[in-house]
Curated annotation (Swiss-Prot):
Name the record gives this protein: Pre-mRNA-splicing ATP-dependent RNA helicase PRP28
Regions of compositional bias (Basic and acidic residues) in chain numbering: 35-49, 60-83
GO BP of this protein: mRNA 5'-splice site recognition; mRNA splicing, via spliceosome
Originating gene: PRP28
Location(s) in or outside the cell: Cytoplasm; Nucleus
Span(s) of short sequence motif DEAD box: 341-344
Effect of F442S: In PRP28-55; no growth at 37 degrees Celsius
Domain Helicase C-terminal: 427-579
Species this protein is from: Saccharomyces cerevisiae (strain ATCC 204508 / S288c)
UniProt entry tagged with the keyword Transcription: no
Amino acid sequence: MARPIDVSQLIAGINKKKGLDENTSGKISKPRFLNKQERSKQERLKENEESLTPTQSDSAKVEIKKVNSRDDSFFNETNDKKRNPSKQNGSKFHFSWNESEDTLSGYDPIVSTRAIDLLWKGKTPKNAAESSYMGKHWTEKSLHEMNERDWRILKEDYAIVTKGGTVENPLRNWEELNIIPRDLLRVIIQELRFPSPTPIQRITIPNVCNMKQYRDFLGVASTGSGKTLAFVIPILIKMSRSPPRPPSLKIIDGPKALILAPTRELVQQIQKETQKVTKIWSKESNYDCKVISIVGGHSLEEISFSLSEGCDILVATPGRLIDSLENHLLVMKQVETLVLDEADKMIDLGFEDQVTNILTKVDINADSAVNRQTLMFTATMTPVIEKIAAGYMQKPVYATIGVETGSEPLIQQVVEYADNDEDKFKKLKPIVAKYDPPIIIFINYKQTADWLAEKFQKETNMKVTILHGSKSQEQREHSLQLFRTNKVQIMIATNVAARGLDIPNVSLVVNFQISKKMDDYIHRIGRTGRAANEGTAVSFVSAAEDESLIRELYKYVRKHDPLNSNIFSEAVKNKYNVGKQLSNEIIY
């Protein structure tokens, strides 16, 4: 067995490979300990050697050239002008050796800090990561790309809440689902200039016009939300799917659509808006659609004459419609669509029996082949409305608009205290002077309306008109015309007229006498703050009000404050002891 190699021979072989001196290659030197001065001297010598001898990595960096970089001529040109030409070719550092030995003189790194990089720094959108994770917004997607989450966001955006089994998704725009005929589409977008549907229109039209199954519909939405067009468009769509009828057949079968509304003013407003659409649509489609209204104030002879050539759409108040049916002025065999507009107001005005009577008559007189569709619209959902819906509607779709706070009308509510009518008028004069017309003042009694109009005539320069139930139909229409054409600045009206008014841009609503019910209060102040405009509602409270109503009013004013500007007078709080109990509940 061979003897193992000596350690000295192994070390000598390693040193030989490294090119060390042969005299020391075979010797093992004993470690020698250095003092502090010797160690410092050795470190300085080592640093000088490293600085004078470029490493392999440094040499590689010198040879690398910058390629395919962005064009920085604009930024570099500016920086070059600021440099001192005499120093551009000089060394960056001054050492004891020659400049030719400076290894950094030609150093041009491929990566450097540039002005353009500094400008672009931080320009990445903050929500870039969120967008890449969550995906595109529903407005950026096509219809087939929409998923359940997108439809849910769309409903949240427009404050649409639905229930009632399978409910169709809302319209994203007028054209996409091809529900509306092209000729009617041109009327809506080009002639009437409605670029996009309102929330109530978005959810009503696809659910009412679903050809697979005509379902009943109950919509809860505030006034001024576009409800009229929401039911007029489906009526016209359904009519366009059948051939036009001659006048003789219209007389024999009666109207195709029946629209009930609580007041004369609202009936006439619906007729006017519907005729605005049908007049243009008739020219586009050659479909002669006749719209007739039946309201109180017109004699039976006048109604009989207007119905002599039949009609396609009938708009009526419940009482006058029953009179016409009992006098055999019309028949209702072919009513395909029945609309109850402002259903809660009809109930408030005592029309519940008349409404149910009409619904029964329509069902009894209808031909067996007619599949009637019932649409109901209301601003508030009450037990009576629910009872009617349960009794006369078949598995309806329920849709509520404006549940979210952000969709509330932009109304500032101000509640002031006044001892009597004289005190109210004294406080009212400077208020109305601050607002542009039109202005609506609501009162509870006709005598107050006449007294208030006389006060304005004597003590101000403002022109006023009066609207209440004692006026004849011609007087009411004349008053509304004066108000709509800005010939008078203020209209004094009772609750009866509150629902039927459709006056745009009302800047101020005054409750000179607070209403007896909260529903009426809500409908009154709803005359302003419409179509995303801001409005103001001022209410005067005296010492003779119902305490429960004032407590309810206080809660409503505190809860519905979209502008964060509501004012509830301390005098009213102290008089009716409201606000204190709520504070105690919060504290304890």
